[in-house]
Amino acid sequence: MPLANPQLTKFTTASPVLATFSFQELTSGQSFLSLFPMRQEDSSSIKNSLVSQILISNPLATGSSAATGSFTKIIDLDFDALINQNFDIAGNAKVNLVHGARSYSPSRTAEYYTIVKVRRWDGSTETDLGSVQTVTHTYASGAGSNFFSWKQESLDISLSESRINTGEFLRVTFEVWAKQGSNSVNIVIVHDPDNNVTGVDDNSQVINMTDGGTITWPSKTIINIPLKIDI
């Protein structure tokens, strides 16, 4: 419909987006993107994802037997999030994770640690942005059997400033390294956004997040990615 006054120009562009920031974001120049690693199993495969929603992971955990002798990488998991909007990463990522060990017989020992890596992946090439290694934990099953021993980690990862472009992936990798004595010990890392107390791992072994009947540990892993804000 034409305007009554020909000196007026019809407004044809959308109104500008109004961005709001918290005091912490304004003073630090960064915000955090909270992501949860999870696995989804169907009839043909298991898919690993980084999600922002509280979903159930199936399996709840991933486990593997430690190697005898020297430290060997026994678990190597990549969790990906497809990026649909360019953003810049700068600062320290914050990670909470739980990993542990279990044996089905008494008097078994093992040592283990986990390395967490944050990467950019374009579908063919990985670019490492930062990594951190947990302390090395020692497990001893004592006189009992089927005994879990869980360890909770709170970690910082210093990240190289980097832009993640539309169509690329933000990738978080978990490497579990372990060694055992002369008998088998299973090392487990959990990744359930819904934080369930019981479930199964990728070998259909029952997972119980209660340690010795006194403490119930979280089964979710959280990665807080620092995003640079241009204000």
Kindly give the residue locations of the regions a language model identified.
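Proprotein-processing/basic-patch segments
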Residues: M1-N92, N96-R108, S162, F169-I231
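Aromatic- and Gly/Pro-enriched, solvent-exposed loop/edge beta-strand patches characteristic
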Residues: T109-N183
